[in-house]
Amino acid sequence: MAELTIPADDIQSAIEEYVSSFTADTSREEVGTVVDAGDGIAHVEGLPSVMTQELLEFPGGILGVALNLDEHSVGAVILGDFENIEEGQQVKRTGEVLSVPVGDGFLGRVVNPLGQPIDGRGDVDSDTRRALELQAPSVVHRQGVKEPLQTGIKAIDAMTPIGRGQRQLIIGDRKTGKTAVCVDTILNQRQNWESGDPKKQVRCVYVAIGQKGTTIAAVRRTLEEGGAMDYTTIVAAAASESAGFKWLAPYTGSAIAQHWMYEGKHVLIIFDDLTKQAEAYRAISLLLRRPPGREAYPGDVFYLHSRLLERCAKLSDDLGGGSLTGLPIIETKANDISAYIPTNVISITDGQCFLETDLFNQGVRPAINVGVSVSRVGGAAQIKAMKEVAGSLRLDLSQYRELEAFAAFASDLDAASKAQLERGARLVELLKQPQSQPMPVEEQVVSIFLGTGGHLDSVPVEDVRRFETELLDHMRASEEEILTEIRDSQKLTEEAADKLTEVIKNFKKGFAATGGGSVVPDEHVEALDEDKLAKEAVKVKKPAPKKKK
């Protein structure tokens, strides 16, 4: 047997050196097991330290969110394809709460509720992430709404104005033009975006919740054709997606928008629509065995929407003065705005525009019911020119609707009532507007001035819209300085109003009604004053009394 030639001291020092330099390549993972799975929900055992809203990793890289933390199991919502999740599979904790990438790289992109691009244009360029469940700005971090957000829709900007940082609910039955109102509002921000002025520019986020794929594609196409995708992000959770995605989509959109708001920028976010999010959350809650409440919704469905919509704010100047304006959409059934979800969201928001089926079917589009629609804070942000010309518009229309119902049964009306009906019919016609044709605010002021100033009283109702269109074309070509003055000063001075009246009078002389008649009103002839009339004394000769015989 050969002798050991290496000294014992060398062996000892080599072992000590190896031990001192050794690092154990081990990691501690908390692993659970799927007990049962189905319908986008999985119950997992063996994760005692998991946090609420924590991300869990299922086999195949599929993610889930821990929602129910029971004594012996965790109820998780699976985000994505849940068909391959089976009983017995291992589930790992990630130690992270749900977050999405944010930044300017999202402009012009279509993403899913996880922030992953689905438009086939490669990865989104982003190096910042934002948690989905961040608190809304506190009271001290906010300031009052004072800047207008122009929608380009006459009926809204005149009667239910929206300010930057406001939450204005768009509510109505299906197929009444709710999405069209919001898309037109996005299109109307194009001029501000092209100005390059950060104080005017408004970034837009459109969140599609449970919409048909064809509807989302049509919205994207409309925005592209209108040049609006340059400043818009679409977060899409189509009808075919899981309930988890529909529940999550609004929070993803608001996280992307909040990032810009805290950078001092102005953002508009549209939730289309929150009814479907509430229904998805109801499905998730029932599958997780949470106790149902009214209409089978869980008890925290109010909190679901309040914590989302409270993120809309006008930040204080110390935080950059950015704003996030929200236009949530709610779909009603049979015009019932007193149902559970509609009343919840009405109480959370700062006003609502109610779109009515009957008005829509009568051809009044946008079909806004003036009597029920209101804006609680936007009036402070309305420009002075619009306040001056539209001050009596709401009252005039409300009285017209009331008188219209009465006139259906009355056989004879007095002259004042007839005049009110005539003007009301012209105002209704004036407020009609084609889809995807938002109007600049200075042209809206001229248009409303026509109606409330009585300049359309001599124009036949069927010619009102043609008269308005041709007058605005004439002013763009020959009277641009009046429009520019209104746009820059945001006021309608007495001098500008006189000029505008003169332009309208001159334009009427060359405008021919459909029947070929003139629209120039007849000159008003004033009655002569009684003092100016020559007084004539009339003497009456009485016959002499007969003598008595």
Curated annotation (Swiss-Prot):
Biological process (GO) annotations? proton motive force-driven ATP synthesis
The reply to whether Nucleotide-binding figures as a keyword in the UniProt entry is yes
Write out the entry's keywords from A to Z.
Answer: ATP synthesis, ATP-binding, Cell membrane, CF(1), Hydrogen ion transport, Ion transport, Isopeptide bond, Membrane, Nucleotide-binding, Translocase, Transport, Ubl conjugation
> Which terms does the record give in the GO molecular function aspect?
ADP binding; ATP binding; proton-transporting ATP synthase activity, rotational mechanism
Localization recorded for this chain is:
Cell membrane
> What do the Gene Ontology cellular component annotations say?
peptidoglycan-based cell wall; plasma membrane; proton-transporting ATP synthase complex
Q: How does it sit in the membrane?
A: Peripheral membrane protein
Query: Cross-link (Isoglutamyl lysine isopeptide (Lys-Gln) (interchain with Q-Cter in protein Pup)) at which positions?
Result: K499
Which catalysed reactions does the entry list for this protein?
ATP + H2O + 4 H(+)(in) = ADP + phosphate + 5 H(+)(out)
Q: Name one Pfam family in it.
A: ATP-synt_ab_N
Cite the PROSITE patterns for this sequence: ATPASE_ALPHA_BETA (PS00152)
Which residues bear the site annotation Required for activity? S373
UniProt binding sites for ATP: G172, D173, R174, K175, T176, G177, K178, T179
Instruction: Give the main location.
Output: membrane
Q: Does the keyword Plastid apply?
A: no
SUPFAM superfamilies (alphabetical): C-terminal domain of alpha and beta subunits of F1 ATP synthase, N-terminal domain of alpha and beta subunits of F1 ATP synthase, P-loop containing nucleoside triphosphate hydrolases
Catalytic activity, EC:
7.1.2.2
> How is the subunit organization of this protein annotated in UniProt?
F-type ATPases have 2 components, CF(1) - the catalytic core - and CF(0) - the membrane proton channel. CF(1) has five subunits: alpha(3), beta(3), gamma(1), delta(1), epsilon(1). CF(0) has three main subunits: a(1), b(2) and c(9-12). The alpha and beta chains form an alternating ring which encloses part of the gamma chain. CF(1) is attached to CF(0) by a central stalk formed by the gamma and epsilon chains, while a peripheral stalk is formed by the delta and b chains.
Per the entry, what this protein does is: Produces ATP from ADP in the presence of a proton gradient across the membrane. The alpha chain is a regulatory subunit.
Family stated for the protein in its record: Belongs to the ATPase alpha/beta chains family.
Designated name of the protein: ATP synthase subunit alpha
Question: Which species?
Answer: Mycobacterium tuberculosis (strain ATCC 25618 / H37Rv)
Originating gene: atpA
